[in-house]
């Protein structure tokens, strides 16, 4: 996947699910399923419900995403 095809959008984590999967409510009120990006897993960055995160979506599947950044 080319990096320019990615859609980046902010949201809030609503619920933590098994296997490092989260329900994220985007700023436009859509709720999507997201998993943690590999670099965040590698550096043991913890994500809790209520955290503000940056999510990457592909144009092919707008209901699943990848969490790439947790705001402080």
UniProtKB/Swiss-Prot annotation:
Family to which this protein belongs: Belongs to the IF-1 family.
S1-like domain span: 1-72
CDD domains noted in UniProt: S1_IF1
Keyword DNA-binding: no
One Gene Ontology term of the molecular function aspect: translation initiation factor activity
Gene3D superfamilies xrefs: Nucleic acid-binding proteins
Positions of disulphide bridges: none
GO cellular component, one term: cytosol
Source superkingdom: Bacteria
Sorted UniProt keywords: Cytoplasm, Initiation factor, Protein biosynthesis, RNA-binding, rRNA-binding
Record organism: Campylobacter fetus subsp. fetus (strain 82-40)
Protein name: Translation initiation factor IF-1
Subunit structure: Component of the 30S ribosomal translation pre-initiation complex which assembles on the 30S ribosome in the order IF-2 and IF-3, IF-1 and N-formylmethionyl-tRNA(fMet); mRNA recruitment can occur at any time during PIC assembly.
Entry-linked InterPro entries: NA-bd_OB-fold, RNA-binding_domain_S1_IF1, TIF_IF1
Record's keyword annotation contains Protein transport: no
Gene: infA
Subcellular localization(s) per the UniProt record: Cytoplasm
Its biological purpose: One of the essential components for the initiation of protein synthesis. Stabilizes the binding of IF-2 and IF-3 on the 30S subunit to which N-formylmethionyl-tRNA(fMet) subsequently binds. Helps modulate mRNA selection, yielding the 30S pre-initiation complex (PIC). Upon addition of the 50S ribosomal subunit IF-1, IF-2 and IF-3 are released leaving the mature 70S translation initiation complex.
Entries under PANTHER family matching the protein: TRANSLATION INITIATION FACTOR IF-1, CHLOROPLASTIC
């Amino acid at each position: 996947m080319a990096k320019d095809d990615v859609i980046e959008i902010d949201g809030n984590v609503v619920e933590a699910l098994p296997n490092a999967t989260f329900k994220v409510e985007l700023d436009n009120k859509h709720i999507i399923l997201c998993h943690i990006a590999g670099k965040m897993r590698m550096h043991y960055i913890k994500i809790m419900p209520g955290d503000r995160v940056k999510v990457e979506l592909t144009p092919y599947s707008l209901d699943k995403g990848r969490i790439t950044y947790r705001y402080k």
